[in-house]
UniProtKB/Swiss-Prot annotation:
<dbReference type="GO" id="GO:0050566">
    <property type="term" value="F:asparaginyl-tRNA synthase (glutamine-hydrolyzing) activity"/>
</dbReference>
<dbReference type="InterPro" id="IPR006075">
    <property type="entry name" value="Asn/Gln-tRNA_Trfase_suB/E_cat"/>
</dbReference>
<keyword id="KW-0436">Ligase</keyword>
<comment type="subunit">
    <text>Heterotrimer of A, B and C subunits.</text>
</comment>
<dbReference type="InterPro" id="IPR042114">
    <property type="entry name" value="GatB_C_1"/>
</dbReference>
<dbReference type="Pfam" id="PF02934">
    <property type="entry name" value="GatB_N"/>
</dbReference>
<dbReference type="InterPro" id="IPR003789">
    <property type="entry name" value="Asn/Gln_tRNA_amidoTrase-B-like"/>
</dbReference>
<comment type="function">
    <text>Allows the formation of correctly charged Asn-tRNA(Asn) or Gln-tRNA(Gln) through the transamidation of misacylated Asp-tRNA(Asn) or Glu-tRNA(Gln) in organisms which lack either or both of asparaginyl-tRNA or glutaminyl-tRNA synthetases. The reaction takes place in the presence of glutamine and ATP through an activated phospho-Asp-tRNA(Asn) or phospho-Glu-tRNA(Gln).</text>
</comment>
<dbReference type="GO" id="GO:0006412">
    <property type="term" value="P:translation"/>
</dbReference>
<keyword id="KW-0067">ATP-binding</keyword>
<dbReference type="Pfam" id="PF02637">
    <property type="entry name" value="GatB_Yqey"/>
</dbReference>
<dbReference type="InterPro" id="IPR023168">
    <property type="entry name" value="GatB_Yqey_C_2"/>
</dbReference>
<dbReference type="GO" id="GO:0005524">
    <property type="term" value="F:ATP binding"/>
</dbReference>
<dbReference type="GO" id="GO:0070681">
    <property type="term" value="P:glutaminyl-tRNAGln biosynthesis via transamidation"/>
</dbReference>
<dbReference type="InterPro" id="IPR014746">
    <property type="entry name" value="Gln_synth/guanido_kin_cat_dom"/>
</dbReference>
<dbReference type="InterPro" id="IPR017958">
    <property type="entry name" value="Gln-tRNA_amidoTrfase_suB_CS"/>
</dbReference>
<dbReference type="GO" id="GO:0050567">
    <property type="term" value="F:glutaminyl-tRNA synthase (glutamine-hydrolyzing) activity"/>
</dbReference>
Length: 472
């Protein structure tokens, strides 16, 4: 039996307005090579100037994961050649990163586990190579975008743990609002270092790096395939030949990893301090940066203060947008449990395909009005589902307008309900007698008959109240 050893390196693009060492915009999707200047193009004489906002965002992350924030950190040149790296070196941090010795906690199959974070350092992103037909093109818009590289300890023992760690990290980054962490656009990318060893062995064996994984599903599949490949090689006696220190890519079509190149050692990059950048010396006020409420804190507050079930609270903190939507709902002085049900179950049940809570056709204000109409008895919960479906498809229609159009307004007028109840009781005198002699279950019969006669428009609470008075 083997034990799996996984360490993850995550590159997240920080959401600063400008690049890390120049004033070019960081906006995604612009025409190729338009967000560039002499600094990102590495023209002679162009000098880097550090973006203060990138430093603040790195510090915020460090505080969120209980890390040590170094008052002094140093930028280094990482030397290698690639077409999308115009300087032929990347400005990064090596021996003195801005953040080190952090931690976060994951929960897998009901068990909590601490995962150490070795370091988080600032660096610049490279450009992008685009291969079309027989040509390769280079877009340098991304070159110089600020990255925070977050390196975990090799303490993850399964693909499930790796995905749980990444989801937790992704959530923290989003709640801090230091990155949009959009995996599809490449602003949250993961490299997985995977090795195996016999159970009980503490030695670290040959690790393989799988590069640029950009979805939780692919990360899981890539790790599972690589573990299977290495395990089979060990059992077949071909481990030393088949498993070498290398970088592999994940084939998302066939769900296999393929060899890309040999894995470089740190010495091969010839790191040395960048002579164009002074060491970063942090003043005390930088270390006092306030960070927002994090997912675990928010979850605890929802449970303790609002009486929400843990499973529901998990859904509410599943994304920054979801928690913002919920907090916007409860800020309207609504019943928190009703809000949870109508958000987690009813609205989320309608959001399919490209629709997410972020671009939901029904916003928090509109859903809040619907919940108010349930609370004040204007409509029943059953009718409210029809109203929600209607305004979901007809976005320009307001809740009250939809209630009128659909004719779903409840009758709460005592005299109208009383008149119908009188008719039903008179027509069922025998059942009234049975009820009064102790057959309490007949109460449901009278409620059902009244609601049927009122064609579902009667306020159920009013019906119950009047029936109890009439039946004594």
């Amino acid at each position: 039996m083997f034990e799996v050893v996984i360490g993850l390196e995550v590159h997240t693009q920080l959401n600063t307005k400008t690049k890390i060492f120049c004033s070019c915009a960081t906006s995604f999707g612009e025409a190729p090579n338009t967000n560039v200047c002499p600094t990102c193009l590495a023209l002679p004489g162009a000098l880097p100037v550090l973006n203060e906002e990138a430093v603040k965002k790195a510090i915020a992350f460090g505080k969120a994961v209980n890390a040590t924030i170094n008052k002094k950190s140093v930028f280094n040149r990482k030397n290698y050649f690639y077409p999308d790296l115009p300087k032929a070196y990347q400005i990064s941090q090596f021996d003195i990163p801005i953040v080190e010795k952090g931690e976060l906690f994951i929960n897998v199959k009901g068990e909590n586990k601490r995962i150490g974070i070795t370091r988080a350092h600032l660096e610049e992103d490279a450009g992008k190579n685009i291969h079309e037909n027989n040509f390769s093109k280079v877009d340098l818009n991304r070159a110089g975008t600020p990255l925070l590289e977050i390196v975990s300890e090799p303490e993850l023992r399964s693909s499930d743990e790796a995905v749980a760690y990444l989801k937790k990290l992704h959530s923290i980054i989003r709640f801090l609002d230091i990155s949009d962490a959009n995996m599809q656009e490449g602003s949250f990318r993961c490299d997985a270092n995977v090795s195996i060893r016999p159970k009980g062995d503490t030695k670290l064996y040959t690790r393989v790096e799988i590069k640029n994984l950009n979805s939780f599903r692919f990360i899981q599949k890539a790790i599972e395939y690589e573990v299977k490949r290495q395990s089979e090689a060990w059992e077949d006696g071909t481990y030393e030949q088949e498993v070498v220190q290398e970088t592999r890519l994940f084939d998302t079509t066939n769900l296999v990893t393929r060899s890309m190149r040999g894995k470089e050692e740190a010495a091969e990059y010839r790191y040395f301090p960048d002579p164009d950048l002074l060491p970063v010396l942090l003043k005390d006020e930088f270390l006092d940066i306030k960070i927002p409420e994090l997912p675990d804190e928010k979850k605890a507050r929802f449970i303790d203060e609002l009486g929400i079930k843990e499973s529901d609270a998990e859904v509410l903190i599943s994304s920054l947008e979801m928690s913002r939507f919920f907090e916007s709902l409860i800020s309207q002085n609504l019943n928190s449990k009703l809000c949870v049900n109508w958000l987690n179950t009813e609205l989320m049940g309608l959001l399919k395909g490209e629709l997410t809570i972020e671009n939901s056709p029904v916003d928090a204000q509109k859903l809040g009005v619907l919940i108010k109409r349930i609370e004040d008895g204007t409509i029943s919960a059953k009718a409210a589902k029809d109203v929600l479906a209607f305004v979901f498809e007809n976005t320009s229609v307001e809740i009250d307008e939809a209630i009128e159009k659909l004719g779903l307004k409840q009758v709460s007028d005592d005299s109208a309900i009383e008149a119908v109840i009188e008719q039903i009781l008179n027509a069922n005198a025998d059942k009234v007698a049975e009820y009064k002699s102790g057959k309490d279950k007949l109460f449901g019969f009278f409620v059902g008959q009244t609601m049927k006669e009122g064609k579902g428009a009667f306020n159920p609470a009013k019906v119950n109240e009047i029936l109890k008075t009439k039946l004594g």
